[in-house]
């Protein structure tokens, strides 16, 4: 049976086009309680006390919990497998609710009520006394010598991680490249450029807001139904946050209305679990607003890239350097991995004859936490690399296509980070085909002679995408297939269907491997 590669109907198609597909909010039971998060109104400081008197007078309020009530357990939120090597484990830097405020809108308390309106009214009536500190908004302020650490129990400064990478000699520096080039070429034969480029924060803007509901069954097992990309990791982190065995926690992931990496983080599931435990196991629903999602969940990293490039007048890149400074916000999330991934990809695009030097700094600030977002640091790397490439080509007056063809990676390149050889690159052919298809040479020549405030132009860029965590962590994958009594098969795996067609593709793979019909795999 050869079904892989064949056109089949998606296994989730009917439910999605008819509206029968059930998302998290569609599955909640009747008479469910509603939670509302109380957020800090300062960006940096300490919660001293709460006055809950007026809030408890709102009809329908069942319980109010604060940062003084939650377990004293710090946990990570990144959607990574738990590394066996301690230095590569995700950073445990937050609690279910935080007394130490690190951003405007930090989670400090929560209201449980009979309906959403009562919960929201009570949340607005809670009075909070703070000890306020000066916010640390920029990377420059966070890295200043006199900057106060936002996580003094974990770091003596605000640098989450500094990743140093080179290509060429292991101790290569850009300054070494300058010296070596100076001894091989005359000053009129080489050009050294220094440029600075920035990328902004971006919100994921998925249609379905972060939503979950939770309950405790008669055996004391905590179940959280959540719109998440990482149910198994949410299970581990929720147990860690509550201080209970993992076996007591169950996570159910229904259909997901978009995530794009924001839901590859543990968001409000631990709080939701704590809320249901606080009311004797009654089901509690917790959905945050669009405003809360943008300010309080995750964003793409804003990264400042300070770049240097050394090139010969005939168009050969000799050396490049990237100093990347990532504004990670208040909590670590995926940050320690994303900026490093950005640096890794920067050095993989071009073959610098003398070498490449990369330093990546991921920094805590008093701002929304940055985490996973589509392509995981690679858009920033491509922006830095391609802006620098265009500027180098412009500095020597060379066509950008020609410049890239002369310097881009080719078949046989060995990535020094993991030893993987590039056996099928095809990049040069891609550039040449694109060049021919859009009539690049003709347009490049004619557009260069324009004047005036409004002009036409053509541009091009390349990038590479790498995936996986080797050699930092083990690459593992597994699935379980259960043969049912009627000859059909139940397929169980950790991969999450989030619109990309994973359930359909894995069903095809299971069908072809076992010989069981495609429509008999569930």
Question: For the regions a protein language model found, what residue spans apply to each?
Answer:
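Glycine-rich loop/linker segments at domain edges
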Residues: 6, 12-15, 86-87, 158-212, ...
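Flexible, low-hydrophobicity surface segments
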Residues: 1-161
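Short, surface-exposed loop/turn segments at secondary-structure boundaries that line and modulate
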Residues: 65-106, 141-154, 233, 250-272, ...
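Helix-loop-helix junctions that connect adjacent transmembrane helices in secondary transporters/permeases
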Residues: 148-242, 408-488
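Short coil/turn connectors at secondary-structure junctions
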Residues: 31-34, 58-62, 98, 105-108, ...
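Flexible, glycine/charged-enriched surface loops at secondary-structure junctions
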Residues: 134-140, 398-407, 441-455, 518-522
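General beta-strand structural signal in soluble alpha/beta enzymes
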Residues: 19, 63-67, 103, 193-197, ...
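Alpha-helical support elements that line or immediately flank enzyme active sites
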Residues: 37-71, 109-130, 212-280, 337-348, ...
